[in-house]
Amino acid sequence: MKVVFFGTPQFAVPSLERLLEHSDIDVVAVVTQPDKPRGRGKQLIPSPIKKVALDHQIPIWQPKRVKKNAQTLTKLRETNADAFAVVAYGQILSAEILQMPKLACINVHGSILPKYRGAAPIQWSIYHGETQTGITTMLMDEGMDTGAMLLKAYTPIQLLDNADKIATTLANQGADLLIETLLKLEQGELNPESQNSELATYAPLIQKEDYLINWTRHALQIHNQVRGFYPNCFTTFREQPLKILATAPLGEAYWEHLPSNIAQKIQPQWTTLSSLTSSPGEVVNLIKNLGPIVQTGEGLLLLLQVQLSGKRPQSGWDFVNGTRLSVGEKFLMV
């Protein structure tokens, strides 16, 4: 089977690698986003997918706008591919491109469709407190993740899982599902299922304001924001930005889902801690070898990992010691 692969970030790498390993699949070309300038020197950095393609000496095409690039369109046609496989490519494909392969354009999407259509399904599923997510393969159409569904695979989201961890799991799961989808497609063994648009939810691009922590929200909501938008959520501490990288919501609903060292240390103090009256963002206690406990609009939140501006990530307890943090200090929403 001749396949053209469209993809860009690390999430797409396992899918491309799995295709390259398969004896019945021939990856004839890779389409990825143009190299992006990074750092102070604005050095052009290739995408993770381009690096894999270079290692395997596969033709690489990097149009700024694939549907408007006549040269790329001609090359795509000339591949005479059986299928196009698309994994987090980052551009919308035109009807002209979708009709080129003999069998279909297959997309690997990081959610259980029709929930979380869009650019950031993993992040928003965690943000909204989902306890399960997965991968859907689908036949692509001109809409945003609206095509007929082919296969699905599920994975649980644990209380302390963040977007990076779930993305790694789903990237590998998606690679397996892509192979299965392509082989079954070739054998005519798939039964496409139309999406019910009434059940659709959306996962748009994340904006900078989505990263700002509002301490008046529920502790679990802030926790889900921190792990869903990892590693970008921030607050203000002593008039400087402070990234919050890992947290744990505290209380009876969470003990069994937290590591034993957290539950065992805090549970005996819980009656006292939970009766404190403090304002949102205020430090109410410092737990040795763990970190500060912060009051939220509803409930308490333990800060497990943070990052001061210009510094490396550090544990909550190292942050307490390094800044000589005191009970009563406040994190602000500025």
From Swiss-Prot:
Tell me the Pfam families matching this sequence.
Answer: Formyl_trans_C, Formyl_trans_N
Phosphoprotein recorded as keyword: no
According to the UniProt entry, its GO molecular function terms are: methionyl-tRNA formyltransferase activity
Q: What is this protein called?
A: Methionyl-tRNA formyltransferase
Q: Where does (6S)-5,6,7,8-tetrahydrofolate bind?
A: S111, I112, L113, P114
Cellular component terms per the entry's GO annotation: cytosol
Q: Which CDD domains match?
A: FMT_core_Met-tRNA-FMT_N, Met_tRNA_FMT_C
